[in-house]
Amino acid sequence: MTAPATVPAAVTALRDSRLGRAARARWAGWGSPHLRKIVLVGLGGSALLALGSLGAGAPPVYDPVKRTPVLALLRDPIGERAALAFVYAGLAVLGMAWLYLGRALRRGEEGTDTGRLLKIAALWGAPLVFSVPLFSRDLYAYAAQAQIAHAGLDPYRFGPVSLPGPFLDEISGMWVDTPAPYGPLFLGIGRAVATVTGDRVVTTVFVMRLVAVAGVLLTARYLPRLARAAGGDPRVAVWLGVANPLVLAHFVAGGHNDALMVGLVVAGLTVAIEATEERWVAVGVVLCSAAVLVKAPAAVAVAFLAWVWAGRLSGRAVLVRACVRTGVVAAVSITVITGLTGLGFGWIDQLNASSQVLTWVSVPTAIGMLIELLRGVPNFVTYQDPVIAAVRFGGQVVTAAVLFWLWLRAGRAGWVRMLGLSLLAVVFLGPVVQPWYVLWGLTVLGATRLDRRAWLVFAGTSFWLSMMIAPQGSNLFLDWAPVIAMPLVAAVATIAVLGRSRDEVVEPVAAPGKLVVSAPPGDRELGPVASVR
């Protein structure tokens, strides 16, 4: 009868020990009790996602989970349904914790400084580093393309079908003949990974995920500095660009190489905007050029760095001279890096490889689909439909015009904000939109000064898009149930949590770690297109 009493006694002894007191003191340093609850809830959501990935994620064909006692239960029909519930519950819990974290930030609660927010993001992301790939099978495609390059084949001429073996088994039939659409820097990194990991699928996929995580770490390192230089709030930037459930679910758990592109862009922008000498602006151009050699949309960032260089020049025609210098440095950087990889420029011919995907979130694709629907074309059309192709081409023309207009406005409206809007224009006016693409522009815009409307729009969009890909990677944008339900859920949750702070607006920090809260801005304050440096 005395045995049960020993358990509380042991717990009490541990709590009162030196180790227990140190642990409690360290935990108390995470902020207010309310914030600590938010941290634990978010960690619980992330853990649920990782657990659910074992049964509902995107495992390899030769699945080690099936051969592991106990975990194999998640692969039977009942276990898979339970795992699916874990994933969606975890995503919802993580998303709500993130919204409440944003609310705590707006209110200036203890522990919402930049450093603590970065630690919270790291804590939430840690379980997902070790999960089965979630919301995409792109990691397997990266691994297969890395093997092709490692085998000495041209990844811009040959698809995964050219190299039979365990990696080919992981690729969807839709993509087996498709050459790599990514830049030579990314494929060069993949080739180096394949040299070390060999033909071990799970190991190769895990290391390729670490490449994406490295991109997130780059963003975490430089984004607060970019926000300070651009007149934004570093804490808001971290909340939107690092702790965001879109980042955790798709950049970490999904392992998309967009994470590396965004990290290099943010690093390049930061080095350039902080530069006191022209050579450091050139370094920023080199970093953004390296991002282009991961994914092509980073070229937009290179173009906007001409405005930074122009600010370091004096005399006549400074913008023209800055454009020339930016272009020369970018061209030399791209040529040298491409030459070092030995992979050539064949990736340029593959930039439209993803156009086989149809989603109504792409404005041109949605217009084309609507036209065909009104014409009575049965069911959904394919990407080869002439109307879809024509409208998409028109979208590219409009995109070019919009980008040029935003670039011209950068001198008056702030180049960082105009760059963020330009990247969003590339996404929504492009032929294909995937949820994580929004992070291209959202991360940059998070570094600028945001009003309450921008908070609500960006937060609601992030929450909504984080739920629009099934755990195994299938797109939900053509399924009417989630298309209708998910935006409503995201809007209600965002407004309920963030829309209540009407009387408080976080201003840009006066110094790192110092919070300034003021009354709501009047009409004279600039909103989503405010001028920033």
Regions found by a protein language model. Give the residues of each.
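Start-transfer (signal-anchor) and selected internal transmembrane alpha helices
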Residues: 1-48, 68-127, 416, 502, ...
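Perimembrane helix-loop-helix junctions
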Residues: 301-331
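Transmembrane-helix motifs of polytopic, lipid-linked glycan transferases
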Residues: 44-46, 93-102, 203-230, 263, ...
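Aromatic-enriched
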Residues: 449-533
